[in-house]
A protein has these predicted regions:
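Polar, low-complexity export/assembly segments characteristic of proteins
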Residues: 17, 24, 28-31, 35, ...
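Amphipathic alpha-helical polymerization modules
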Residues: 1-146, 292-399
Length: 399
């Protein structure tokens, strides 16, 4: 027979009571926090997995936010190009295309000068549209979103359109003759004699003839800048393509998205073989200048050369307008891809969130049930304690 003593009973009771109290408090904490664990030590395996999921979730959420900003930026860009495209493709009553059709006919008469002014005004309006912003950044400024991309330099008929400080009508410089090493350019003095003395060198030799060294270097610098902005400059964004760097620390281009929009890739830059601008705004501005030279009363051309130039530029304007439409369509495709990528990132976020909640969060119904049972057990322990204390007190009185 096992002898039950008062001290033994109290000791067992205290142990069970403490355990019931701990279980109740733990169940209460779980119900309040709605988490399965609150420290790494409580469940190291689950905590490590939750950390990995949380890191992936934060990265995906960041990619989604960046992509959302890019999507809205492209929406602004698309709407702007839609407006510009309508202006140059005869979709509005004051479109540049309609003006050119009028200008090519011989029925303008005294309205030629007014039409020319409208053409120049339209060119100015296109530039203002292309200087649109999304938030604090200019949409068509490439990687330099803080500074206005397009601006006019000069006044009147001599004004020139510049993109980020570089004239858009800069012509690609011709190749220059090189020395025997195939790298160093040949230089010539004022008499056209080849010289290696830098102090006497004033010209390079090209297929088009002699060119001033300073002028050529300036032209090449400007052309290289335009080429870099149009084809080489990038504004990378992590949109969930697995952004990674190579061994030199450079971002692998295929792992990021280039979200920089260069205005000159849409409007054009440089000059063609005839020396005419490729930029659609410059062409429209030049057409307006030619019309404004016409006689204010009769509308006659200022010269036969002006009429010939106008006809030549009118055809090139139509070609530039067609290229602008193609670029607009291309942007539509890019915008659709970004939207599709956003949908994928949203789906990834939802999946990670579901996995994350499955590891860290408790089922609320189970938590309430566990707490209710723990509370019940604790209350029973208190009642048992009352019985034990009462019996002990009676034993004490009876002794």
């Amino acid at each position: 027979m096992i002898r039950s003593t008062t001290n033994g009973t109290l000791k067992t009771y205290r142990y069970n009571l403490q355990r019931s109290s701990y279980t109740k408090n733990k169940a209460q904490e779980t119900l309040q926090t709605q988490r399965k664990f609150n420290s790494f030590a409580e469940d190291p395996a689950a905590a490590a997995k939750a950390f990995q999921l949380r890191r992936s979730l934060l990265r995906t959420d960041s990619q989604y936010n960046v992509g959302d900003s890019v999507k809205h930026k492209y929406e602004v860009a698309w709407n702007t190009l839609e407006s510009v495209t309508q202006d140059v493709n005869n979709r509005k009553s004051d479109s540049a295309f309609a003006m050119i059709l009028q200008g090519k006919s011989d029925t303008i008469g005294s309205g030629a000068v007014a039409l020319g002014q409208s053409m120049r005004t339209l060119a100015t309006g296109i530039v203002q549209s292309m200087n649109c912003r999304y938030g604090e950044n200019f949409v068509f400024a490439g990687a330099d979103g803080l500074n206005v991309p397009f601006e006019w330099q000069g006044e009147g008929d001599d004004r020139k359109l510049c993109y980020r400080g570089i004239p858009v009508d800069t012509k690609e410089p011709p190749e220059i003759e090189l020395g025997a090493d195939g790298k160093t350019p040949k230089t010539f003095d004022a008499t056209g004699t080849e010289t290696t003395d830098p102090a006497k060198a004033v010209s390079y030799k090209t297929k088009d003839g002699m060119v001033n060294i300073a002028d050529y270097d300036k032209q090449k610098k400007e052309w290289d800048a335009l080429e870099y902005m149009a084809k080489g400059e990038r504004k990378n964004a992590d949109l969930g393509f697995g952004m990674q760097e190579d061994e030199k620390g450079n971002v692998i281009s295929s792992s990021v998205a280039n979200v920089g929009l260069q205005g000159i890739t849409f409007l054009g830059y440089g000059k063609d073989a005839d020396g005419d601008p490729k930029n659609i705004v410059s062409i429209a501005d030049r057409l307006g200048t030619l019309l404004r030279r016409c006689d204010t009363n009769s509308g006659d051309w200022a010269s036969a050369a002006d009429k010939k130039e106008f006809s030549r530029l009118a055809k090139k304007f139509e070609d530039a307008a067609s290229q602008l439409t193609d670029k607009h369509t291309e942007m539509d495709t890019q915008a659709a891809f970004i939207k599709s990528n956003q949908d994928q990132l949203k789906a990834n976020t939802d999946t990670l969130q579901e996995q994350f909640l499955g590891i860290e969060d408790v089922d609320l119904a189970d938590a309430i049930t566990s707490y209710s049972w723990a509370q019940y057990c604790y209350n029973v322990s208190i009642k048992v304690g009352n019985s034990i204390l009462s019996q002990s007190l009676m034993d004490y009185i009876n002794t």
